C-alpha cells in the first residue's frame, strides 16, 4: 500500500479517488526515493541574526539565503549578507555541504514544497535547508523538477499533513526513473 515510500501520516481525510491515486503513486514500479541516497543539511542558525546579518553587501561579506529568497526552480537573490565565520554560530552543518558544487535548496516551512538549484555554493539560513541527492544516472535538476511538481505537492499535502518540510518527507517522495533524454527534456522545460 502507501507504505512503499516513507510516510508519517494517516490518510483518514483522503477521498476514495485521492487514496487510489496515492496508492498508484506509491506502487509505481519504475520509481525510487531519496532515502539512503542523499545528504541533508540544515541552514545556519546564527543565534543572533541582528548581530550577524547585513542588509547590504560589504567587503568580505557574501550572500546568505532565507526560505523567502527562493521560489520553485529559482533563487530570487539574497535579502541578507554575512561575514562567514563558521565557529561563531549557534548551529552549522559541515561547511562542505554549503559549498557543494551543486545542491538543492528547499523552504523548511510553506504551503507547498519549494525547491531551487544552486551551483554557486551559496550559504543558507535555517529557513532554507539543503538536500544533495546522489542517485546514479539521475540529474539533480530533474529531481528538483519532480519535487516542485503538482504531483509531489498533492503527495505532501495528503500524506505528510505538514506545513514543515522534513527530511523524512523528502526521503519518501516518489521519483519516477527517467532516461537521460527524458530528464534533459524536463530540465529544459523548467530552466
Predicted regions and their residues:
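A short, charged helix-loop
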Residues: 1-2
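Polybasic, glycine- and aromatic-enriched phosphate-binding surface used to engage nucleic acids
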Residues: 11-185
Amino acid at each position: 500500500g502507501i507504505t512503499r515510500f516513507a510516510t508519517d501520516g494517516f490518510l483518514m481525510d483522503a477521498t476514495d479517488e485521492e487514496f487510489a491515486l496515492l496508492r498508484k503513486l506509491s506502487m509505481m514500479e519504475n520509481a525510487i526515493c531519496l532515502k539512503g541516497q542523499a545528504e541533508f543539511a540544515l541552514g545556519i542558525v546564527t543565534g543572533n541574526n541582528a548581530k550577524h546579518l547585513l542588509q547590504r553587501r560589504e567587503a568580505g561579506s557574501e550572500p546568505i539565503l532565507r526560505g523567502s529568497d527562493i521560489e520553485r526552480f529559482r533563487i530570487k537573490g539574497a535579502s541578507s549578507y554575512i561575514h562567514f565565520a563558521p565557529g561563531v554560530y549557534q548551529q552549522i552543518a559541515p561547511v562542505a555541504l554549503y559549498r557543494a558544487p551543486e545542491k538543492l535548496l528547499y523552504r523548511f516551512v510553506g504551503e507547498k514544497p519549494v525547491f531551487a538549484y544552486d551551483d554557486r555554493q551559496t550559504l543558507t539560513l535555517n529557513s532554507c535547508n539543503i538536500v544533495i541527492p546522489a542517485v546514479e544516472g539521475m540529474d539533480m535538476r530533474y529531481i528538483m523538477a519532480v519535487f516542485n511538481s503538482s504531483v509531489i505537492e498533492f503527495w505532501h499535502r495528503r500524506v505528510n499533513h505538514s506545513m514543515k518540510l522534513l527530511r523524512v518527507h523528502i526521503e519518501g517522495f516518489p521519483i519516477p526513473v527517467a532516461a537521460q533524454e527524458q530528464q534533459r527534456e524536463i530540465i529544459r522545460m523548467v530552466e
